[in-house]
Amino acid sequence: GGCCSHPACQNNPDYC
């Protein structure tokens, strides 16, 4: 869940 479930965040793990 959370941001890590969004492709945009998967491409930017620093945001997870």
Swiss-Prot record:
Summary of the tissues where the protein is detected: Expressed by the venom duct.
Keywords from the named record: Acetylcholine receptor inhibiting toxin, Amidation, Disulfide bond, Ion channel impairing toxin, Neurotoxin, Postsynaptic neurotoxin, Secreted, Sulfation, Toxin
Disulphide bridges: 3-9, 4-16
Gene Ontology cellular component list: extracellular region; host cell postsynaptic membrane
Residues bearing the modification Sulfotyrosine: 15
Cell compartments where the protein resides: Secreted
GO molecular function term, any single one: toxin activity
Residues bearing PTM Cysteine amide: 16
Protein family according to the UniProt entry: Belongs to the conotoxin A superfamily.
Function: Alpha-conotoxins act on postsynaptic membranes, they bind to the nicotinic acetylcholine receptors (nAChR) and thus inhibit them. This toxin is an antagonist of all rat neuronal alpha-3-beta-2/CHRNA3-CHRNB2, alpha-4-beta-2/CHRNA4-CHRNB2 and alpha-7/CHRNA7 nAChR subtypes.
Free-text comment on this protein's domains from its UniProt entry: The cysteine framework is I (CC-C-C). Alpha4/6 pattern.
Protein name per Swiss-Prot or TrEMBL: Alpha-conotoxin TiIA
